[in-house]
Amino acid sequence: MTTSYVAVDLETTGIGTKREKITEIGMVKVVDGTVVDTYHTLVNPYREIPERVVELTGITDEMVKDAPGIEELLPSVVAFCDGFPLLGHQVIFDFGFLTQATVNAKMKFEKDGIDTLKLCRYLMPGPEKKNLGAACAYFGITPDTAHRALSDAMSAHLLYQKLMEQFGEARSELFEAKKLVFKAKKERPATKRQKEHLQDLLKYHRIESAVHIDKLSGNEISRMIDHIIFTYGRVPESAGGRKGKTAAGQSAVPRLFPESR
């Protein structure tokens, strides 16, 4: 059975790894069942955090405005996890975001992992809810703060220990870390022309934006441009418009920018 691991939990602006960003990282390093170290940091997503996410996590724009970006934190995150499998409740979610970030930074992040959600689905009674909060309540675990990264990482660790105590001897094969697989492509960097086009649109339509343009990928800027053109219209050529093209150089496709944005 796997008894040494790093329990991990991330808070993010949403679900998709290509469109959403990390806002908080919590990790708990465990050696032979004993907690030996923890890691916690807020992360600046360089964009506005959606209100529904603020309500869920309590993490606000004000809290992250002076926090480092994920690119600054990756070396310490990767080093903290080095030599250990990951453990988490739906661990592929956390692994996916970290993988996308490391791919963008041209770093490697290959890991084995243990998913406490899958263990709960195998081992808990069918009618019982299997989300982290419900599973912890079922096993008598009281988390410090729900939907905060370090607290949830600790809860996943304690849940795993309870599951091992009750089922490890009879179902030891379920408690072995397995290779985590998540395919991620490096995001295309934004061009100077894209950034200028977006800035022109924001200025002309007097749109206030909390997004840091220099931190956006090319695809993200293209989606923003398409959304602004669809909603507000183009910048007229007489006002310095860029001949009715999107930043990628193609005719704008009328489509709404994703709500999670």
Please describe what each predicted stretch is.
Residues 146-149, 213:
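Acidic carboxylate-rich catalytic motifs and surrounding loops in phosphoryl-/glycosyl-chemistry enzymes
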Residues 1-111, 125-147:
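Conserved non-catalytic scaffold segment of RNase H-like nuclease domains
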Residues 162-261:
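Acidic two-metal-ion nuclease catalytic site recognized across multiple nuclease folds
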Residues 12-14, 118, 155:
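Short, glycine/acidic-enriched loop or turn micro-motifs at the edges of active sites
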Residues 111-123:
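A short, structured active-site edge motif that brings together acidic residues
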Residues 148-161:
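Acidic, divalent-metal-coordinating active-site segment for phosphoryl/phosphodiester hydrolysis
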